[in-house]
Amino acid sequence: MDMSFPKGFLWGAATASYQIEGAWNEDGKGESIWDRFTHQKRNILYGHNGDVACDHYHRFEEDVSLMKELGLKAYRFSIAWTRIFPDGFGTVNQKGLEFYDRLINKLVENGIEPVVTLYHWDLPQKLQDIGGWANPEIVNYYFDYAMLVINRYKDKVKKWITFNEPYCIAFLGYFHGIHAPGIKDFKVAMDVVHSLMLSHFKVVKAVKENNIDVEVGITLNLTPVYLQTERLGYKVSEIEREMVSLSSQLDNQLFLDPVLKGSYPQKLLDYLVQKDLLDSQKALSMQQEVKENFIFPDFLGINYYTRAVRLYDENSSWIFPIRWEHPAGEYTEMGWEVFPQGLFDLLIWIKESYPQIPIYITENGAAYNDIVTEDGKVHDSKRIEYLKQHFEAARKAIENGVDLRGYFVWSLMDNFEWAMGYTKRFGIIYVDYETQKRIKKDSFYFYQQYIKENS
């Protein structure tokens, strides 16, 4: 096998607190927006919730021994803010801190590097009650929480991620309303975008100014956008190109630009102002504040699953006059096209468009309809094929000069898939939610072997 993954390449797997921990109200934990959102009827498929999830809170030792058997070099997980500050601020909950003490110690004992996401969507409900991420005050509440946790674990946790997928936090939570807190207001979503960026900068700045010996980055879900031009004899007009490009800026550059260049994409802001989706004063102050607070992160995390193919459609009811195309090909259970070339294209585009930065693929994986066969096994050959192709795209990107340092498969185990409840399985470990039994899928053994051969 071609040994072109660099020495020390971080092979990992990823999870998130709300999706696996369960124990939603145990040991002093406060209510999060996902607790509230899932307990309200009709928000989640089949009324599923994360009250128990994979019960990782009580079974983390078993889960860490599975990680060790897998041969993971690193494990990416998130801390539940509501376990540390049940109300989001004020009194610290010692039992919450002690849980993460035990988890982190267990990982380190087993030679697995903990990579910690500070915020993976489970905001304390008490903070949502005062506006959540749309309230500028939240920047300070987040800062206090983040610095408390970083200072407690800085000797054992060297890689920190401020936010997981700010795009989803802002637009799925505050515009489309399909994620907690379920708000549907584009202007509010833009306030959220800005709070997230300022919160990110504030933590990175404090870590650097106080010479804390850790690295801080952020994880963005990025989707390369392709213009549908394959229609016979069709000439793409300038307006089409521009609209598809603007839609890509909303998905990608709206976060990449401030994080790596210290400014929002101006063309996009102008368009939103013109469409009355953003106040012109607000657009000015957003640019100004990002410029003043900008600080370059230590690394960039990328979550990649698929691409988007779009074409111009003046009858579209979306923000831009475009619609999605679904090219012929292989799709996962999420209805996402399997397109490994997109990962390569994305990595090369970032390398060519932005200042140099170490990159980690912080999530990549696929949901398939996994079943336990009579022999008690899960034969997930499609997932193996998916991972193989994406690892290959990553390897090719490294050969082309991309500074890729690690790769985290989503996910270590099947878990609560947000609005889809438990209907979509992403794990390389199967979870029987009735019994909490863990079953290693074929992809577990494939990844175990792949790590061995590429370390």
Curated annotation (Swiss-Prot):
Belongs to the glycosyl hydrolase 1 family. The gene is bglA. Gene3D superfamilies: Glycosidases (3.20.20.80). Its EC number is 3.2.1.21. Disulfide bonds: none annotated. GO terms for cellular component: cytosol. One of its GO terms (molecular function) is beta-glucosidase activity. This is Beta-glucosidase A. It catalyses: Hydrolysis of terminal, non-reducing beta-D-glucosyl residues with release of beta-D-glucose. SUPFAM superfamilies: (Trans)glycosidases. Keywords: Carbohydrate metabolism, Cellulose degradation, Glycosidase, Hydrolase, Polysaccharide degradation. C.saccharolyticum is an extreme thermophile and appears to be a Gram-positive anaerobic bacterium. It holds the Pfam family Glyco_hydro_1. InterPro entries: Glyco_hydro_1, Glyco_hydro_1_AS, Glyco_hydro_1_beta-glucosidase, Glyco_hydro_1_N_CS, Glycoside_hydrolase_SF. GO terms for biological process: cellulose catabolic process. Transmembrane segments: none annotated. The active site is at residues 165, 363. It is an enzyme of class 3 (hydrolase).
